[in-house]
UniProtKB/Swiss-Prot annotation:
One Pfam family hit: HAD_Pex22
Protein's recorded name: Peroxisome biogenesis protein 22
Alphabetized UniProt keyword annotations: Acetylation, Membrane, Peroxisome, Peroxisome biogenesis, Protein transport, Transmembrane, Transmembrane helix, Transport
Membrane protein topology class: Single-pass membrane protein
Annotated segments matching region Disordered: 66-107
Main subcellular location of this protein, as a coarse class: membrane
GO cellular component terms listed in the entry, alphabetical order: peroxisomal membrane
Similarity comment: Belongs to the peroxin-22 family.
Role: May be tethered PEX4 to the peroxisome membrane and may be involved in a late step of the matrix protein import. Does not play a role in the biogenesis of the peroxisomal membrane.
Species assigned in the record: Arabidopsis thaliana (Mouse-ear cress)
Subunit structure: Interacts with PEX4.
Superkingdom of origin: Eukaryota
């Protein structure tokens, strides 16, 4: 039993245009009769002519794409056949001419990976770079001696001896490269002052070129050390006395408070570390 196929949209449009054409032809034949022509004006004739032209162009617009598709289909088929055959020939030639790739050994892969890892490994900054970064381009630094540069922690101990901490020498050298460094301390007598200068000279502090004996200042009271700092107006001051750090916080841009235990309250511009070596990352 044959199945009835529904007409396509194009066929329906063609039928509609044919009916419209027949209707227009009938109307035109009746209008152009001898009795009707006399009653027509120029507007009616123009409307009829426009309708006829519209029907003709609509018919050509519907008919032309179908004919063009029918004419172009063989070319597409031929082009697709040529393309597929060319692709097949190219793939066969590639398979025929290709040589089995060399397989790298695990040792070679590991060696290449090691080179890549070493190349992209982050570079560790030098001590000089760390000092300069921590000081924030500070051009002048003041620092007390007891408990920071010297092993001794009180003026009474300086009456017996003065010992420079060996671990601080490298940091001192880097600080003197970038900043104007002043050392200061409270002493009880002239003999203590001489012992301190001799200890610094024996440690090679004055031979580096950045520090001279004239930049080592002595006083007899803690207030005297505070006055030194206020007069010099450094960018950084390093001290172990929390009271002095608190007093100078309003006047000095940055301070480093050296202490084993961090104070409960410190100003925002006061940093705390167990030693200057630890603060600058040299230990």
């Amino acid at each position: 039993m044959a199945e009835s196929s529904s007409p396509s949209p194009t066929e329906e449009i063609v039928r509609l245009i044919k009916r419209l054409s027949a209707y227009v032809a009938f109307k035109m034949s009746s209008l152009f009769s001898t009795t009707s022509i006399r009653n027509l004006d120029s507007r009616s004739i123009g409307a009829i002519a426009g309708l006829a032209i519209a029907v003709i162009f609509t018919w050509r617009a519907i008919r032309t794409p179908g004919e063009q598709r029918q004419r172009r289909q063989p070319k597409r088929r031929i082009h697709n056949a040529e393309t597929s055959s060319a692709a097949a020939a190219a793939s066969q030639s590639n398979l025929a001419s290709s040589v089995a790739p060399e397989v790298s050994s695990p040792r070679e892969d590991n060696a290449v990976q090691d080179v890549v890892d070493q190349f992209f490994q982050p570079v560790k900054p030098t001590l000089g770079q760390i000092v300069r970064q921590k000081l924030s381009e500070g051009r002048k630094v003041t620092c007390r001696l007891l408990g920071v540069i010297l092993e001794e922690t009180s003026p009474e101990e300086l009456q017996k001896q003065a010992t420079v901490r060996s671990s601080v020498l490298e940091v001192l050298l880097e600080i003197t490269k970038y900043s104007d460094l002043y050392l200061m301390e409270r002493v009880l007598d002239d003999e203590s002052e001489a012992k301190v200068l001799q200890a610094l000279e024996n440690a090679g502090v004055f031979t580096s070129g950045g520090l001279v004996k004239d930049k080592v200042l002595f006083c007899s009271t803690e207030i005297g050390r505070t006055s030194f700092v206020r007069q010099l107006e450094p960018d950084w001051h390093i001290d172990t006395n929390p009271e002095i750090s608190t007093q100078l916080a309003r006047f000095i841009k940055y301070q480093l408070h050296v202490a084993t235990v961090k104070p409960e309250r410190t100003a925002p511009n006061v940093f705390t570390s167990q030693s200057i070596e630890q603060f600058f990352g040299s230990v």
